[in-house]
Amino acid sequence: MPININKFILDMERFDGTLKKYPEDFIVEEITPEGTVLEVGKEIGFEDVEKWHGSFIHFTVEKTNWNTMDALKQIVRTTKTKRKNFGFAGTKDKFAVTTQRFGCFGLKKEQLENINIKDIVIRDVQKSNKKLRMGDLWGNKFTIKIRGLDLSKKEIKRISDLKLDYVLNYYGIQRFGLIRPITHIVGKFIYERDFESAFYTYCGTPISETGDSLEARQLVDVGEFKKALKLFNRNHDYEKRLIQQYLKYKDFKMAFTALPPQLNSMFVNAYQAYLFNEMINKRFEYGFDAKEGDILEDNTPTGTLIGYNTEFSGGIQGEIEKEIVERENLDLKKFKIEDFGNFYGTRRKMITPIYDFKSSFENDIFELSFKLERGNYATIVTREFTGNLS
């Protein structure tokens, strides 16, 4: 089951290079709703609210080689509090240097300021009366280095002269799984209420594993769950939770209740994203200028994230959307899934602007800098040059 990312905006010969050789090669700086860039290594000095009700504290987390969820787990463990006391505006990947805002309640500023975790810096601690929620950001600024290029001066000039004002608004590989792109497959099985297949796909189905991880997944595939548990390491916490819950209740659907609700939602979201990416591919041949029947956002055609309350476009775009629904044999009402969530069916722009795009060459390194609105993926920009998603 592909992830449906196969069209390009730039008409060019793409070059080979190494992305993310070091975490410092991929810098992600969150941008607040007010437009403030949380710059690496820089104190912002957010002001406390005048009349604090003693509820919420917001703070910036700068981290190297930590993803959002793992960093949060460590912060929770260090402060000896509960996961539900924390929130964040957006998620960030692991192999990078990233900044982002977190929020919490039930803690003192001093507790946060005194946290000492390797490769994590906490600063800009601010008293607030507002809960920080997912989506409370404008977007992100990216500074990316692609190494190991062997290009002629002519090729360098050609690439340096390229202007990239927008990209196809694909969901990136992160939505489906960087190492094991199976999240959308699990999501499809959950939509179909085939929880057994969802379980085996997530816990078994080895793809690129080696060693104990490979053997553990092979054991899952043949039903040797207890043996698999002994081989999965701490990097496979969710697999272990699923298996332990299944062994306790002997029920595949019940097993998924051991996972965080956000993760269970992400499975179905990934299936929606997979279908959306296909809409972009099908719309590509017709162009992305507004056409009769389009539902527009900022004068840009949108596609539907198929859900229980989907509003179909008219015209060509509507035909594309309905064709995919019919091929997948989807019953929209089934996107209300007990214990997993109600997946409404929003819309998303099929192309997205790039802001403040800059590029430069130095020695064998191509450096890109740009800003994207929230929900958009930097790897979709870099693949325009390299052709690769990772």
Swiss-Prot record:
GO molecular-function terms, A-Z: RNA binding; tRNA pseudouridine(13) synthase activity
Keyword Transcription in annotation: no
Task: State the EC number(s).
Answer: 5.4.99.27
Q: Which UniProt keywords apply?
A: Isomerase, tRNA processing
SUPFAM superfamilies registered for this protein in UniProt: Pseudouridine synthase
Q: Which reaction does it catalyse?
A: uridine(13) in tRNA = pseudouridine(13) in tRNA
One GO biological process this protein is involved in is: tRNA pseudouridine synthesis
Domain (TRUD): residue spans on this chain: 166-353
**EC supergroup of this enzyme:** isomerase
- What InterPro entries does UniProt report for this protein, alphabetically? PsdUridine_synth_cat_dom_sf, PsdUridine_synth_TruD, PsdUridine_synth_TruD_CS, PsdUridine_synth_TruD_insert, TruD_catalytic
Does the keyword field hold Glycoprotein? no
Could you name the active-site residues?
A: 93 (nucleophile)
**Belongs to which family?**
Belongs to the pseudouridine synthase TruD family.
PANTHER family, from UniProt? TRNA PSEUDOURIDINE SYNTHASE D, TRUD DOMAIN-CONTAINING PROTEIN
Known function: Could be responsible for synthesis of pseudouridine from uracil-13 in transfer RNAs.
Known HAMAP family for this protein? TruD
- What is the name listed in the Swiss-Prot or TrEMBL entry for this protein? Probable tRNA pseudouridine synthase D
